[in-house]
Structures are given as C-alpha cells and as structure tokens.
Amino acid sequence: MRECISIHVGQAGVQIGNACWELYCLEHGIQPDGQMPSDKTIGGGDDSFNTFFSETGAGKHVPRAVFVDLEPTVIDEVRTGTYRQLFHPEQLITGKEDAANNYARGHYTIGKEIIDLVLDRIRKLADQCTGLQGFLVFHSFGGGTGSGFTSLLMERLSVDYGKKSKLEFAIYPAPQVSTAVVEPYNSILTTHTTLEHSDCAFMVDNEAIYDICRRNLDIERPTYTNLNRLISQIVSSITASLRFDGALNVDLTEFQTNLVPYPRIHFPLATYAPVISAEKAYHEQLTVADITNACFEPANQMVKCDPRHGKYMACCLLYRGDVVPKDVNAAIATIKTKRSIQFVDWCPTGFKVGINYQPPTVVPGGDLAKVQRAVCMLSNTTAIAEAWARLDHKFDLMYAKRAFVHWYVGEGMEEGEFSEAREDMAALEKDYEEVGADSADAEDEGEEY
C-alpha cells in the first residue's frame, strides 16, 4: 500500500484535522467509533482507504494521524468529542504550557521537550505501513506551535525519513483578520526553516476563505468551523486520489513531479469549485465547463493574489464525481482559447488532469450543498509571490523598530536568525520574479556578466 501519515500541529492544525477526519469518515462510511459496517456497499469493496486508515484485528479503523499541541485544551476537545473513540490515545500528544505565539518557544524551549515523544509515535505509525509514501503536515504560519514546532519536526523528519515526501497544508496569516501581532515574524522564521525540508506546501489564507464563505455561502459571520469544513473539502479533493480508485489516479510524488519546477518554488495555489449553498445549487446546472471556469476566478482561490498578474508554471485539475474526460478536454480547450492565462514561455501549456468517480461528500448540517461533481485546481503561479511580499512588508515594519524581538531572544534565539530568514524570503521573492521572466530576457542578462 501507499500509506500517508497526517501530522496535525498546533491549534489550527488540530482543528483542521478534526474537520478532515470527520469528512474522511463520512466518505468511507466509517463510524465515529472506527467500525465500518460490514456490508461494504459504500466503498464497493475498494480498500484504497487503507492509505489513511489502519485496520485492527477487531475491525476498527484507526486514522494514520498524530495530533500535537504544546497546550492541552484543543486536543482535550478531541479526547472528549464525538470522535474520541476513533483515535488511539497515544496519537493525541499534548504538552503542559503553550508556545504563546512565539516561534522560539515552539522551536527551541518547549518544542524540544516533546519532539522525541512525537517522533516515537510517528515511528510507531510508520512501522505499521508497508510502503509509506510520505507525510501531510497541517499547521498555521502565525502561531507559536504551528510555526516553531512544525519547523523543528520537519527538520527531524528529513533526518529520519530522508526520502519520503513531506507535503504541508499551511494557514497563511490573513491580511485583515489577525490573531496575533507577531504573525509576520513567526511566518517568515518558519518558512525559512522549512523551505528546504518541505516538498510541496499548499497555502490557505484565512481571509480568502472568509470571503468565500461570505460571498458564496451567505454566512454573515463565518466561524472557524465554517472555514475548516471548507478547507477539509479541499484537502479531501487533493487526497481523494490516494483514498479511492479512479480512472486517472495521482499519488503524492506525482503532485510534486508535476507542480514543482524548482525545489524552492513549491507553493501551489489551490482553488475549489463549486462552493455553493444548498438553496442556490438547486437552481444551477454546474456542468464540468462551469466548475472548470470557476477555478480560474481569483474569487475562488485559497490565497489572495491575482494570477492574472502572474504566470502559470504548472496546472493540475482534480475532478471528482460524475465527470468524463470528453467534457474535461472540451472545458480545458475553451479556457485555453479565451482566458487571459499566461504560462511561462519555458513551460508549454500542460494541464494535468485527475478524475475520481467518488462524488464529493458533504457533512450533514454543514454549509455546502451536495453536488454531483467538483474540481480542485492546483496551480503553481508566480502570482503567489504577492502573498510573500505582503508578509515581508509587515515583517520589515516591525523589525525596523526591533519590536517584540526580545521575546524571541529571551527564548534562546539569536537576532541573526531574523535577518537570515528575511534574506531567504527576499531570495524567494527574487526566485519567483526570475522564474516568471521570459527566458530570452534572462539570456541577455547573462552576457553582461
């Protein structure tokens, strides 16, 4: 089997984890106690779900996941919640005191006390796998645990499991909706540390998701539950190909091969369609062409940036539900002719397509309508550099005055790490700029040296 281990770090990671595993269980017909009714009609005898669940002798299905937080309250909710019997108690790991939005606490002081325990749990999960293909790490950029502990964990995973792919789902600090003042510091420190260890990172911007909830689902004040359920649909679409048999199947390494042209340029933009409330869906057709077009609307993206200002390097469309290749090809052909989609000149306009016949599942009582087909587009575009630029600007404003830096230094960091991280981010922005430049321009520059 091609197993994946999910690691959920910090409050954001754990809460997204709750939403994701709730959805996986519904999709595979697994009850909250881990039992799967024996009639097997739901999965149709398809055992691909074993990539995400391991089965015990008693027929209980246990998620291949670890939940880690440096303070107990969030994971305690899992321990007492609906799905408390689903997880092995050892998979829920908590510390005593939290990282207090401080990268240095998550990475150095408090993180190092718990890291060996976490790695031991991960090793136990890895031992149960016959052919582990990689890790999915869920975390936020802004929090102390999400930024600091994740970067520590990624470094250690690279040492212990060097060849395995590591994919991240990272919550990018929203431009307007901020939960901590020091988010720009944490984000840039964690990006710098994790850059060389992560193979592919899907960023999710809370504000973009807020707007989608407000605009498409008519939720006036979206809660984190609303956001997480939407995020879990996207994660589910990305991982569906690993969990179900489909016509065109995609595995973890295949994503990287198709989306990451250079090791550092590994931040694809995710777009999901249709996000629509039940009363609207009733009156709309939502054909393959409709949902494919919707993917190219900046309004449906998970990060606020404008791909019309950037260039595409790669594009991957993952359909699920009632979709036939003929419709997909027609939809893509139309888009290629009329859209203002610019590909970089060194990459011919290739769209990679995955089709999965399992229709999207919705959480009962949730906000999304039950639809026959959905699509998730992953595109590697230079426009995402806008997101980095925004973050770097905020970092600069604070760091120019050395605001809040003493909290980090007090936990054993050196000020040099800040400037080093900031330089790395500047280099990343420059990388994106160069990748988007036409290859002809680049050659002229070369002659001057």
Swiss-Prot record:
Cellular compartment(s): Cytoplasm, Cytoskeleton
Superkingdom, natural source: Eukaryota
Annotated Mg(2+) binding sites: 71
Catalytic activity: GTP + H2O = GDP + phosphate + H(+)
Any Pfam family the entry gives: Tubulin_C
Entry keyword set: Acetylation, Cytoplasm, Cytoskeleton, GTP-binding, Hydrolase, Magnesium, Metal-binding, Microtubule, Nucleotide-binding
Acidic residues composition bias: residue spans: 431-449
A biological process term (GO) from this entry: mitotic cell cycle
PROSITE patterns recorded: TUBULIN
Residue ranges of the region described as Disordered: 430-449
Membrane spanning stretches: none
Gene Ontology cellular component terms for the protein in this record: cytoplasm; microtubule
Post-translational modification: Some glutamate residues at the C-terminus are polyglycylated, resulting in polyglycine chains on the gamma-carboxyl group. Glycylation is mainly limited to tubulin incorporated into axonemes (cilia and flagella) whereas glutamylation is prevalent in neuronal cells, centrioles, axonemes, and the mitotic spindle. Both modifications can coexist on the same protein on adjacent residues, and lowering polyglycylation levels increases polyglutamylation, and reciprocally. The precise function of polyglycylation is still unclear.
Domain notes: The MREC motif may be critical for tubulin autoregulation.
Function: Tubulin is the major constituent of microtubules, a cylinder consisting of laterally associated linear protofilaments composed of alpha- and beta-tubulin heterodimers. Microtubules grow by the addition of GTP-tubulin dimers to the microtubule end, where a stabilizing cap forms. Below the cap, tubulin dimers are in GDP-bound state, owing to GTPase activity of alpha-tubulin.
PANTHER family for this protein: TUBULIN (PTHR11588)
Protein name as annotated: Tubulin alpha chain
